[in-house]
């Protein structure tokens, strides 16, 4: 039985979208809501000048912050879809989902990945306003520009490792392995920092000199 309720969809470019109520499985929806709550509770916003005084020495996983929205990639019973915590579901002939479907045999049962849904641009950094425009584009939506940067795993995995995995290093290794050949769906760029100065260097490279919105430190 599918966990999705895909009745009365609306066109989204070459694919389709359910505005709300697209997740019929309450346990799955609870996982999405619980993850979002834990992420929001765990975030602490810092100015770049505060990095040295607020970040402790020790191993950290540093990633560029992409200006998009938190969504979830869900693989279940041969289906692949994107959902947010409101049960808005994107499915069908969407290029990034087609990419996932092509590697369906890699996943072990139901798998759920958290990530940033964004609109890819060539010359500037992604902006959440572009995503809002794309998702509101109906039949004319440019879904070929949608990208998904995976940064965590909630459930499932592949033949080498499955959740639960307590250490982020283990989850990261799994994500990098599964999505290593992805073009539209990739594991977010992640580097190891050991000191506040290391973190500041990544900020300078990715934010000041690059197109990242900010820095995520785990």
Model-derived regions: residue spans:
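Low-complexity, highly charged intrinsically disordered N-terminal segments
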Residues: 2-21
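Exposed boundary/loop context
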Residues: 8, 14-15, 27, 35, ...
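Charged, flexible boundary elements
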Residues: 18-57, 62
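Amphipathic alpha-helical
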Residues: 30, 186-218
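A short, Trp-centered hydrophobic/proline-enriched beta-strand micro-motif
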Residues: 38-41, 61, 113, 214-218
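Short, motif-level signal for alpha-helix interfacial/capping segments enriched in acidic residues
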Residues: 45-49, 124, 128-133, 194-201
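Covalent nucleotidyltransferase
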Residues: 53-183
